[in-house]
From Swiss-Prot:
Keywords: Disulfide bond, Secreted, Signal. SMART domains: PhBP. It is found in: Secreted. This is Pheromone-binding protein-related protein 6. It comes from the Eukaryota. CDD domains: PBP_GOBP. Pfam families: PBP_GOBP (PF01395). It comes from Drosophila melanogaster.
Amino acid sequence: MVKYPLILLLIGCAAAQEPRRDGEWPPPAILKLGKHFHDICAPKTGVTDEAIKEFSDGQIHEDEALKCYMNCLFHEFEVVDDNGDVHMEKVLNAIPGEKLRNIMMEASKGCIHPEGDTLCHKAWWFHQCWKKADPVHYFLV
């Protein structure tokens, strides 16, 4: 009899990790802003909308075009230094609104030292780290 509440608890925990997608999340204003950068970076990198959606709403996966798309977004949002390395202070300063900034700060706590041989790989490392840290709120435009 004890196993049924445990199973329900495990199902509830798994469901709680599903990405939030509703009329207010991801924030419509951010999606609108992000479309501009998507329209710049997608053609530059050759990433597919399916790869972006799968990473955002589905499973973390490795795709070179997607990795470079993420790097392009960092450059377009101007959150990198002269060497192309991401600076979290710039990322946080680029995020509008205290609520969204706090969500990002919390998700970033364990995402400080990126791994990767290229800027594209480092960009992907940040994104997969954020998604693992907060799969409910993470989204990719």
